[in-house]
């Protein structure tokens, strides 16, 4: 079970979290970029906006639109340190560990994959790094650890 699958029912029960949906334009963006690029963008956004011990503008740093990852952050309560504490038990006041970064990234990617469904009807750009990833045994979905490094 993925990180997201373990929380999906809780998000669905929240009036606020359950209202987020990807638009056709956002799905087309995911298809065009591919999951490797979306993963890299997600990690960059999390490292810059959430991972520091005291993120700038915490509580209002995640826009409601502009990138599918932003929408996914609101849908999965990974939008600010307060929501991360309340929903995922990731306490504020410390920089993310690599396990916490992986957990948050996988939570967001899980929601995006769930919302995106089958993207085969959308045009896509071939991933130049996919064959290199396969050759080095890099998986598309690394195992998900518990937040805070608890395995």
Located regions from the model:
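Long, highly charged low-complexity segments enriched in Glu/Asp and Lys/Arg with interspersed Ser/Thr
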Residues: 98-127
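Short flanking/linker segments adjacent to small metal-binding domains or redox-active Cys/His motifs
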Residues: 116-151
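Core of compact, soluble alpha-helical bundle domains
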Residues: 1-46
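Iron-sulfur (Fe-S) cluster-binding segments and ferredoxin-like electron-carrier domains
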Residues: 82-106
